């Protein structure tokens, strides 16, 4: 067995070399990353060896992985030539994108600027699904973004909303989510309305403050240009010329979802986000998000965009955590099924 293993390693057909030359020394340094961090990420993820020689790279490894590494490096360099600053996270995203679809063009995704945040950070899609989501929001009046935590569903929707507000395409932004932990009543909590509502809407405020500086956000909220409110407060209203975002939609009941969708007035757009695997409703209660998908998936003018763990845009461990939990849940479900038999 040991001899067989050695034979595979030394087989000239088992490895391939690629040589890449780069003309701009400054861009080449940016391509490598600080302390060659970008190269280290590529080596670890693709299991190839990359050597730096002057302003060139030598890649060695499995033929398919070597070609993939070369393609990723060429496209990252192309982004740098366009003035896009490549960070380690971008290398991770590039690996995921091109591993899933070798025909993908990083420039089509990463250079699609949505908004420049309060911290002067350019907000762009970071996966094929995120790009499809942004394109859907631009094109359709009602868009559902469904998938696990960390895929950028709410954050990108808010970036689009703020960008459209700043262009005067809408007169206000409305951010809402069901306060399921309080049964949408909020009556037993201490304090005035703002204090009661705040814990359930804090994630929306956090994302808002990442895009608009604190003082400006406060003024927009005070004027009613940006409204952050629990879903129950949407009842009986007609929302005209508004960009409306419903977050945590998996925790709506079918009645609440229908109520929300029928609030939409002239010149308005709605984005509904949620994770159908994270429902916190009481046992036996149907999810409005699941019902909406079943009822509306064929309706013209409504778009559903699905995300997976491959689209997770948080710390790289978040994707590993999601995958591990899903694997464990599947194992438990299989074991329970076997025991019933």
Where are these regions (language model features)?
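Interdomain "pre-motor" coupling segment immediately N-terminal to P-loop NTPase/helicase cores
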Residues: 51-110
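Short amphipathic alpha-helix segments
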Residues: 27-44
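Conserved helicase motor core of SF1/SF2 NTP-dependent helicases
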Residues: 118-128, 136-246, 250-341
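Short glycine-/aliphatic-rich beta-strand segments at the starts of folded cytosolic domains
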Residues: 10-30
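P-loop NTP-binding catalytic core
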Residues: 104-125, 130-131
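Compact, well-ordered interaction domains used in eukaryotic information-processing assemblies
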Residues: 40, 46-49, 55
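Flexible glycine-/small-residue-rich
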Residues: 22-24, 52-54, 61, 177, ...
């Amino acid at each position: 067995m040991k001899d067989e293993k050695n034979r595979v390693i030394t087989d000239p057909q088992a490895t391939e070399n690629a040589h890449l030359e780069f003309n701009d020394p400054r861009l080449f340094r940016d391509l490598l990353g600080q302390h060659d961090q970008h190269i280290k990420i590529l080596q670890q993820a693709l299991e190839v060896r990359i050597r730096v020689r002057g302003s060139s790279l030598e890649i060695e490894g499995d033929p398919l992985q070597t070609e993939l590494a070369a393609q990723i490096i060429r496209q990252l360099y192309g982004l740098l030539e366009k003035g896009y600053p490549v960070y380690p996270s971008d290398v991770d995203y590039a690996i995921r994108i091109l591993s899933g679809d070798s025909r993908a063009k990083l420039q089509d995704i990463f250079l699609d600027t949505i908004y420049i945040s309060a911290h002067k950070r350019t907000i762009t899609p970071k996966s094929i699904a995120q790009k499809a989501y942004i394109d859907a929001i631009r094109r359709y009046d009602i868009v559902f973004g469904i998938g696990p935590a960390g895929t950028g569903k709410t954050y990108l929707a808010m970036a689009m909303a703020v960008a459209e507000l700043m262009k005067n395409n809408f007169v206000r932004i409305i951010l809402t989510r069901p306060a399921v932990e309080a049964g949408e009543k909020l009556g037993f909590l201490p304090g005035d309305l703002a204090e009661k509502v705040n814990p359930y809407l804090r994630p929306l405020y956090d994302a808002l403050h990442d895009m608009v500086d604190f003082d400006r956000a406060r003024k927009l909220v005070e004027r009613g240009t940006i409204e952050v409110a629990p879903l129950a407060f949407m009842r009986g209203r007609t929302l005209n010329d508004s960009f409306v975002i419903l977050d945590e939609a998996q925790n709506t009941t079918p009645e609440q979802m229908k109520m929300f969708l029928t609030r939409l007035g002239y010149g308005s757009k709605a984005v509904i986000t949620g994770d159908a695997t994270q429902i916190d409703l009481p046992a036996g209660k149907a999810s409005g998000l699941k019902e909406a998908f079943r009822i509306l998936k064929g309706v013209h003018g409504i778009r559903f965009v699905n995300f997976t763990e491959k689209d997770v845009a948080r710390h790289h461990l978040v994707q590993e955590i999601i995958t591990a939990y899903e694997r464990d849940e599947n194992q438990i479900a299989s074991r329970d099924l076997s025991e019933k038999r």
